Amino acid sequence: MKSAAIASNPSLNAAQKQPWKLAFFFCFLVLLCDGADIGILAFTLSSLKEEFGLTNVQAGALGSWSLFGMAIGGVFGGWACDRFGRVRIIVIATAMFSILSGFSGFVQSYEQFVALRFVACLGLGSLYIATNTLMSEMVPTKHRTTVLAALMTGFTLGSLVITSISAWIIPVYGWRTLYLLTFIPILLSISMYFLIPEPQSWKEARALKLSGLKNSLEKPENPYKAIFDNPKHRLMFILWSMSSGLLLFGYFGVSNWLPSYLETELGIKFKEMALYMAGTYLTMMFAK
C-alpha cells in the first residue's frame, strides 16, 4: 500500500530520489563554516584594534559593515536562488566568503580589511537563505521539519568551533593565521558543484519559464503586493520584521563585543574568555 501511494504521487517520488541526505551533509558543513566566519570577527577584534590602532568607533564599524553586507547578501541571495539555482548560489557564496576571508589574513590596513569583510559578508548572508531553500525543496515532507531544525544547529556549532579554535590559534600564532584557515571551505564549494544537483522543483519551474508557459500557481508579478494589500498579512509582516530585526540587533551586538569586553574591560584571559563563550554557544545549540 505504501509503495503504491508513493508511486501515485510523482512529487513525493521525485523528492525521495533526490540525494537530500548528501545535500544536508554539505549544507550543514557550509552553515557551520558560515557561523564560524561570522563569529571570527568577535575573537579577533582586540587584535585588530591593537595592530591598526583602531578607535572603538572604527572597531564597531567593522561589525556594522559586516551586518550590512549580510543584509544585502540575504536579499540578493533570495532573488539569485530563484534565477540561477539554489546549489549554484551556495557554491558561489561559499567560495566568495572563503576566498575573501582568507585574504583578510594578508591585509595591511583597516580600509583593506573593511573592504574584504564587507564583500565576504555578501556571501555569508546569501548562504543562509540558499541552504534553507535548497533543503526545503529536497527533503521529503515527513522529514522536513526535523531536518531544517537540525540544519540550523550547524550555524551555532560553527560559533562553538571558532571559539575553540581561537583559544588555541590566536595566543600562539596570531589573528592572521585564524583568517587563513577560512580558505578551507572552498573545498566544500568545489565538492557541492560536482556532487549535488539542483532540486527537481527548481528545474521544472525554470523549464516552464524558459519555454514561456504559464503555471496556474505562478506568483503574481509583484509578490510584495500580496503582502501589503491584505491588512492581516501586512501587520504580520511588519511585526515579524521588527521582532527579527531586534533579535538580530541584540544577538550580533552582544556577540561582536562580548569577547572584547570580557578580555579588555574585565581582564579575563583569552582562553578563559573563549571557554565562557563556548558555554554560551553550546547552550544556544541545544536550545535549537
Residue ranges and their predicted role:
Residues 1-36:
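Cytosolic juxtamembrane N-terminal segment immediately preceding the first transmembrane helix
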Residues 22-56, 254-259:
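Extracytoplasmic
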Residues 41-42, 231-288:
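Extracytoplasmic gate region of multi-pass secondary transporters
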Residues 47, 75-79, 83, 168:
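Membrane-interface helix termini in secondary transporters
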Residues 53, 85, 106-112, 140:
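Helix-breaking motifs and short loop linkers at transmembrane-helix boundaries and internal kinks
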Residues 88-102:
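Structural signature of the two symmetry-related core transmembrane helices
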Residues 116-153:
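Cytoplasmic helix-loop-helix junction between adjacent transmembrane helices
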Residues 151, 155-194:
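Helix-loop-helix hairpin linking two adjacent transmembrane segments in secondary transporters
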